[in-house]
Regions:
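Methionine residue identity
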Residues: 1-3, 13
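Flavin-dependent oxidoreductase catalytic cores
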Residues: 10, 15-332
Length: 332
């Protein structure tokens, strides 16, 4: 089956309302609540379904952001990704990228029509193609403009709860106290804080003290994000910040799909389980897309467990079948 074209539909599609979907379970007693961060081109509905069924451990799966346009149309893959059928039985959190409060408000009504009760605003994407247009973490450059945007957005009652994902500044972490003060003044369902600046992208040191400040500022339900790769990383965070309720994990989950389960005291993934994981993903992607696309996605995903291992990375580059990819990643 060929890949569906990413043509934009002439207007937002509607789905039958199904109440009670997608509300992040922040009031649960098991700490921390674990959010699975999105990775465009990998964590689609097939990925989420297979991960949920084989490993679990993620309380909420965050969807790749919808880049909102003036026409309020969505790509075919975006419509499919947010559909209730694609996310049956899972808590998911739709996310939007925009600098226009009217666009966001209209999109939130669409999210409500899909049956979801919470959605997320992306103020964290550091990609230059996004930030140069004043979207994503580009909105952090001008605190006055950010406040004006949020004032207009919250001037009316929203149809669903709204959360936000942010960075701690654009140029410097010294910007964070002012940004935190702004965010604390609005009724967000939760605030996910990636403890790096836009300039730092995804490399270099992190600033966990920024999360501590968020707790002091009483930002609504702060969620920690940034370099949580192992159970030790999560345990160290909780020891440093006992009041932390929730974490968001991205690259750590890609390298170790059982990480959420292990954080809760479960077992690490064995080789048979990993083999089943990669095989199920490949078969699912192959059914939806072309075989070459499916293999490309598998190889992109496997870059994370192969990170730092020169031999595995060399084998993965040469692999041209799912069997040779699995051999490269898990050694069999």
């Amino acid at each position: 089956m060929g890949m569906e074209p990413n043509a934009r539909k002439p207007g937002i599609m509607r789905y039958e309302r199904q109440k009670g979907r997608g509300m992040p379970p922040l009031k649960q007693t098991t700490k921390p609540v674990i959010y699975f961060a999105p990775m465009e081109g990998i964590t689609d509905g097939i990925f989420r379904r297979v991960h949920h069924e084989l490993f679990g451990g993620a309380d909420v799966y965050c969807l790749p952001f919808h880049k909102l346009t003036q026409s309020m149309s969505l790509l075919t893959r975006e419509i499919r990704d947010i559909s209730p059928e694609e996310n049956e039985g899972m808590n998911v959190l739709p996310q939007a990228l925009t600098r226009d409060p009217e666009q966001l408000s209209a999109w939130l009504y669409y999210v409500s029509e899909c049956g979801y009760s919470c959605a997320d605003l992306n103020l964290g994407c550091p990609s230059p193609t996004v930030t140069r247009r004043g979207r994503g973490s580009g909105m952090l450059r001008d605190p006055d403009e950010l406040r004006f945007f949020l004032d207009r957005l919250f001037a009316n009652t929203l149809p669903v709860s709204l959360s936000v994902k942010t960075r701690i500044g654009y140029e410097s972490a010294e910007e964070w106290p002012g940004i935190a003060e702004i965010l604390a003044g609005y009724p967000f369902a939760h605030v996910t804080i990636h403890v790096r600046t836009t300039r730092e992208q995804y490399t270099g040191g992190i600033h966990p003290e920024a999360f501590e400040l968020a707790l002091q500022k009483r930002i609504p339900h702060p969620v920690y994000n940034g370099d949580l790769r192992t159970t030790e990383d999560v345990n160290n965070l909780l020891a440093r910040c006992p009041a932390a309720e929730a974490v968001m994990i991205g690259r750590g989950f890609l390298a170790d799909p059982a990480l959420g389960r292990r954080i809760r005291g479960g077992e690490a993934a064995g080789k048979d389980e990993l083999r089943a994981w990669y095989t199920a993903l490949y078969e699912g992607w192959k059914d939806r897309f072309q075989g070459t696309i499916a293999l490309g996605r598998i190889k992109k995903l496997m870059e994370w467990p192969c990170e730092g291992d020169i031999k595995k990375k060399r084998l993965l580059r040469r692999a041209d079948t799912i069997e040779s990819c699995i051999h490269a990643a898990i050694g069999e």
